[in-house]
C-alpha cells in the first residue's frame, strides 16, 4: 500500500515541477498502476488510465478507475484548478486526468499537487483474498481500448488453462 510517507514523497517529486537539475525540465508523463499482495489482501494504487482487474471465480472485478477528464469528479477538479475539458481531453490536449509528470498541467503554485489540473494522487483500493481469487491483470489503455474487463479476463483464463502463451504479446 502507498503509505503516508510514500504519498508525501510522491507529492514532493511532483512539486519539484519536473526540474531535473542539469538535464533541464521534463514535460513527459506516465500512468502508474501498482499492486501489492499480502497473505490476506490485495492493494491497488492507480493514477492514470492503466487499469488493474482481478479475476475472482472467473468474473472480472475492477480494482482501479480510469482517470479520464470527462469523469464528473475529475472534471470538477480540473475546472476548479483553472483547466477545461475539450473533446475528452484536458485543455484540449491530454486524454487522461491523472499522471506522474506532465508538469505543464501542474504549474499552479497555490494548489497542492493532488489538486492541480492533472493530479498525481492515486486512488487506492483494497480487496480481500479468498479461494475465489485466481489472478490479477494489469494493463495499459491499449488493451482496455479494445477489450472489456471480462473479455480480457476470459482471454487470460483461456491462455492460463491451456498453458499456451506462445501467441500472446505483452
What are the roles of these predicted feature ranges?
Residues 1-170:
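PP2C/PPM-type serine/threonine phosphatase catalytic domain
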Amino acid at each position: 500500500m502507498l503509505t503516508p510517507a510514500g504519498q508525501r514523497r510522491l507529492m514532493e517529486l511532483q512539486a519539484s515541477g519536473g526540474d531535473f537539475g542539469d538535464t533541464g525540465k521534463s514535460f513527459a508523463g506516465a500512468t502508474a498502476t501498482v499492486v501489492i499482495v499480502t497473505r490476506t489482501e490485495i492493494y491497488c494504487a492507480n493514477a492514470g488510465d492503466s487499469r488493474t482487474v482481478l479475476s475472482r471465480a472467473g468474473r472480472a472485478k475492477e480494482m482501479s478507475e480510469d482517470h479520464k477528464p470527462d469523469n464528473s469528479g475529475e472534471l470538477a477538479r480540473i475546472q476548479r484548478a483553472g483547466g477545461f475539458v475539450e473533446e475528452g481531453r484536458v485543455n484540449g490536449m491530454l486524454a487522461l486526468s491523472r499522471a506522474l509528470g506532465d508538469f505543464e498541467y501542474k504549474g499552479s503554485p497555490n494548489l497542492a499537487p493532488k489538486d492541480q489540473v492533472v493530479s498525481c494522487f492515486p486512488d487506492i483500493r483494497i480487496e480481500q483474498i479468498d479461494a475465489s481469487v485466481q489472478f490479477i491483470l494489469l494493463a495499459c489503455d491499449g488493451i482496455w481500448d479494445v477489450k472489456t474487463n471480462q473479455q480480457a479476463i476470459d482471454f487470460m483464463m483461456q491462455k492460463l488453462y491451456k498453458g499456451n502463451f506462445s501467441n500472446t504479446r505483452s
